[in-house]
Amino acid sequence: MKEKVVLAYSGGLDTSIIIPWLKENYDLDVIAVCVNVGQGDDMDYVKTKAIKSGASKIYVEDVKEEFVVDYLYKAIKSEALYEQDYMLGTSFARPLMAKKLVEIAHKEQAKYICHGCTGKGNDQVRFEVGVKAQDPIIKIIAPWRIWDIKSREDAIDYAKKVGVEVPVTKKKIYSVDKNLWHVSHEGGDLEDLKNEHKEDMYFMVTPPEKAKNEPTYLEIYFEKGAPVKINGEVLNPVDIIDKLNTIGGENGIGIADIIENRLVGMKSRGIYETPAGTLLYAAHKKLESVTLDKYTYQYKKIVSAQYGELVYNGLWFTSLREAIDAFVDKTQENVTGTVQLKLYKGNIKPCSVDTEYALYDEGISSFGESELYSHKDAEGFINLFGLPSKIKALKNF
């Protein structure tokens, strides 16, 4: 009886040719696993293609709701970003995929897990660190680090040689990652920084200049930091993301052209479409500015950056990530209320906030006197606050 390998399978170029390659070079029984995080593929086609390519079995795991509730809601509450711009669409999906791969490997008593990540990317780290955190014994096969195929063009040639159908041509080659949260585009002519990215690559977003000529007003209601209602309508978590992707996309919201510092040491360029995430972060940020006290608000920004880096670097299964989640959850206890946004041709303008937990007080913040604040108190405060500067000036050095 042949030993088994569980393959993270998408039906794309890399994983399509890995099936025959594993059988040819390792003589393994290949079990394909497609983790459905909302990439929008025809799963019946993916199943058929995996079997035709030589897999003995194919699992399709629909984890969209788990992805939103256990991963993306953490992103929203923390407002995690990598290097201030990247909304971590790929990074948040990988630990969930790694979790499912390990579960099925245990179920099938597989000795190996295989992935199609390149030897230059971050995903190889995310997958393998995620797998090892759950099963330190299972062995990893990473074809891109060991086979003779050195480019995507080589991969296409190999696919033709072994008779695997691949929906990519040499004329237009982008590496695309899609899920509920985002679409990323890398490779091809994007690797030359002198090239402006082409708007015809977009899947989710209408180019801003071609978006609607009338503004769209949008209301998002949050409960303890998590979105619950869109325009007054209660929706399930997956439908919330889908609806906001549609609304944001048709208004040209959510395009980012980013140069990022990869974990493995090089810089890379990616074009990202994240309409729902962009809307949710903007609304959540506005609500937090009203409901969090100054020091919690400021410290959370530091923690959010650290959280983004942890997730980007594949360190999901760590005590620090769990501790940050606990801190973030504490900060979200009063982040409840409705934020109205005005959307127009790629721009987002927060219009209003309605929350019973507002720390903003119109009476205190106005220019008039109030019982809690007297203009006369400011003089003593300024004297004490400026005392270090005054002493330094008196010392004259």
Curated annotation (Swiss-Prot):
Homotetramer. It holds the Pfam family Arginosuc_syn_C. Pathway: Amino-acid biosynthesis; L-arginine biosynthesis; L-arginine from L-ornithine and carbamoyl phosphate: step 2/3. The lineage of its organism: Bacteria, Bacillati, Bacillota, Clostridia, Eubacteriales. Its EC number is 6.3.4.5. GO terms for cellular component: cytoplasm. One of its GO terms (biological process) is L-arginine biosynthetic process. L-citrulline binds at residues 86, 91, 122, 126, 175, 184, 260, 272. It comes from the Bacteria. It catalyses: L-citrulline + L-aspartate + ATP = 2-(N(omega)-L-arginino)succinate + AMP + diphosphate + H(+). Belongs to the argininosuccinate synthase family. Type 1 subfamily. SUPFAM superfamilies: Adenine nucleotide alpha hydrolases-like, Argininosuccinate synthetase, C-terminal domain. The keyword Glycoprotein does not apply. L-aspartate binds at residues 118, 122-123. It is found in: Cytoplasm. ATP binds at residues 8-16, 116. It comes from Clostridium botulinum (strain Kyoto / Type A2). Keywords: Amino-acid biosynthesis, Arginine biosynthesis, ATP-binding, Cytoplasm, Ligase, Nucleotide-binding. One of its GO terms (molecular function) is ATP binding. The keyword Phosphoprotein does not apply. This is Argininosuccinate synthase.
